[in-house]
Amino acid sequence: MYFCVVNVFESKIICKTFQGLEQVLAEELIALQAKNVEVIKRAVVCDYDLEILYKCNIALRTCLKVLVPVFEFESNSPEDLYGFAIRIPWENYLDIHQSFAIDFTIQSEYFKHSQFAALKLKDAICDRFRKLNDDKRPDINTDRPDVLFNLHIHRNQVTISLDSSGTSLHQRGNRVEQTIAPINEVLAAGLILLSKWDKASHFVDAMCGSGTIVIEAASMAINKAPNIDRNYFCFKNWKSYDKSLYNDICTELSLQTKSFPFKIIGSDNNKKAVFVAQQNVKKAGFNHIIEIREVSIQKMIPPLDRGMLIINPPYGERMQTFETDRLYKQIGTAFKEHFTGYTCAIITSDTVALKNIGLKPYKKYSLINGKLDCLYCLYEMYEGSRRKPKEIAAE
């Protein structure tokens, strides 16, 4: 077998995201001064730079994982994959006393069982270490490995990367509890960035659930890097880890935070959701910025003047058709009666019920929430006469 493995380490960084958020992520990378930023499907690529690598993990809001490709080669079978992989110098990237794991994404007629391909790669790594270290090998840890490899196979093209993040970057460490079907933090951040909220006006989520959207909004409002308080990153276990540089970046980003003179309000008519949101806001350290109210969107009285409203109402199997139609009519009424001067946005998979809002969006985006195809619609509620219903006791 002809051995042709190309070492591409420290050439590119791949930042993975959700479908529909690629351009937003690209704009974030450009703001970090990343070089040669290129959008691909569900990811954005840029030139490798150690400082950028650390900043991607700490500061990007719409990034799920930060990968660094290490090896590329062609393979037509699991056995072929093993034959190539056992000759790769894994000892340059993994110490025998460290643990490791393998993530994989495989779309290939040559590898019909994705897990088996990942198993062959794991066997190759372990067998190489056994051969070099008197039958000793690194441990496997699928929960929190020291080093995480990513195996990507498309047809017969194999790319093995180092996953610098470890666990997904949406895990900000803010959740004490969660409600049913909470929105992912990366998607929540994407909704806010797509809305073009200027962070110089009020922000409201009138169906806030566990508070994810308002927490992401508060983080943006004060310019706090989303993962600056996170301790676990796999890059900290790499041989190339520069602790001094990492600490300098954290200090630099910490000094960029600022005050926010406007209001951020989350509300929900579910008592349990309100309690969960309050706990999560407290855990995130945003008690002084975010106010959580127990009130329905129909009775919610937002701050006057202009602002941004983003909601993620229940949809899919969680709602019956008649309930959904009625709810969306109420949402449309609330937009018109209570939120003049605001930009209002809604994400939903129920495009039929969406028509009951009775408004024409000025902007629409196709996104995915979990496994559901969704529309994200934005409405400009121009200044005009505003009804003034009595404020309820809950406020």
Task: Label every PLM stretch briefly.
Residues T105, H152-L194:
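Class I S-adenosyl-L-methionine
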Residues M1-Y2, V6:
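Short, positively charged and aromatic/hydrophobic N-terminal segments
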Residues F9-V147, S164-G166, H170, E177, ...:
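Accessory substrate-recognition/RNA-binding modules or partner subunits associated with SAM-dependent
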